[in-house]
C-alpha cells in the first residue's frame, strides 16, 4: 500500500466556526441555545460542561460569528464590552465578581450579550454582592454532555482530514468502542496515529489503532 502524504498539524486551522462544529445529540440543545442570540433572557447565557466536551469551540464560534469581544475573566475590559456581545470563558475559575456584575448589566442593553463558559452552574458561584447573587441564581444555562458517537466520529474524521489521513472505515467504529469520551482524547489519538505511521512508514489501520490505544491506556475491553 502506498504511504499517504501527511501534514503535521498540532493545532486546528483558522478560527473556530459553526460550520466546523460537529453537532450531535450531546450538544444539540447547546448549539440551538447559542444560535438563538440575541433572544437570550437578559442577553445572557452560560454553556456548562466538563473539560473536553466542546464548550470553548462552540463559544468561540459564536464570538467569531457575531464579532464578540473576548474578555479576561479576572480583569474584563468594560469599555470594550459596552454595546458589544461579549465572551467570557472559564467564568467559574477566578472571575472578577464586580466585573461580572457590570458585564451582566451591559448584556441587557442594545447590541449587548454575554456568553459564559463554565464547569459549574452560576447559582453555585461564591459572591458577597447581593445583587450579583440574585443575577447568578437566575442566570440562563445550557449544558453540553460528554460527546456521543456522532460527535466523536465527526471530530475524528475532521482531525484525520486536517492531517490528510484517510484510514479504513473500520478504524472509526473500533476507536469509538474503546476510546475515552473526550474531544482532546480524540485529537491526541489522531496525532499519535499520525506520528506512529510516520515513524514506522505504516498506514493508519485497525492494528495500529489498537497499539496506540494500548500504549495510551485508552483501551476499554
Language model regions located:
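Conserved P-loop NTPase "ATPase switch" module shared by AAA+ and STAND
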Residues: 72-106, 110-120
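Short regulatory helix/loop adjacent to the ATP-binding pocket of P-loop NTPases
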Residues: 122-137
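Conserved AAA+ ATPase "sensor/coupling" helix adjacent to the nucleotide-binding pocket
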Residues: 139, 153-166
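Conserved AAA+ ATPase "SRH/arginine-finger" region at the nucleotide-binding site
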Residues: 139-151
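C-terminal helical "lid" of AAA+/P-loop NTPase domains
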Residues: 173-177, 184-198
Amino acid at each position: 500500500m502506498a504511504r499517504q502524504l501527511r501534514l503535521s498539524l498540532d493545532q486546528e486551522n483558522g478560527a473556530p466556526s459553526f460550520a466546523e462544529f460537529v453537532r450531535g445529540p450531546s450538544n444539540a440543545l447547546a448549539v440551538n441555545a447559542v444560535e438563538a442570540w440575541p433572544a437570550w433572557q437578559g442577553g445572557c447565557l452560560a454553556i456548562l460542561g466538563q473539560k473536553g466536551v466542546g464548550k470553548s469551540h462552540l463559544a468561540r464560534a459564536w464570538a467569531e460569528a457575531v464579532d464578540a469581544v473576548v474578555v479576561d475573566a479576572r480583569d474584563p475590559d468594560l469599555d470594550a464590552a459596552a454595546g458589544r456581545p461579549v465572551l467570557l470563558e472559564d467564568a467559574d475559575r477566578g472571575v472578577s465578581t464586580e466585573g461580572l456584575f457590570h458585564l451582566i448589566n451591559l448584556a441587557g442593553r442594545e447590541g449587548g450579550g454575554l456568553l459564559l463558559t463554565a464547569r459549574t452552574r452560576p447559582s453555585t458561584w461564591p459572591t458577597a454582592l447581593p445583587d450579583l447573587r440574585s443575577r447568578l441564581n437566575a442566570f440562563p444555562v445550557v449544558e453540553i454532555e460528554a460527546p456521543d458517537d456522532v460527535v466523536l466520529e465527526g471530530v475524528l474524521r475532521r482531525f484525520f482530514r486536517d492531517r490528510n489521513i484517510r484510514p479504513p472505515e473500520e478504524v472509526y467504529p473500533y476507536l469509538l468502542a474503546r476510546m475515552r469520551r473526550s474531544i482532546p482524547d480524540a485529537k491526541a489519538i489522531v496525532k499519535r496515529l499520525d506520528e506512529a505511521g510516520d515513524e514506522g512508514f505504516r498506514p493508519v489501520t485497525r492494528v495500529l489503532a489498537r497499539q496506540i490505544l494500548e500504549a495510551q491506556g485508552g483501551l476499554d475491553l
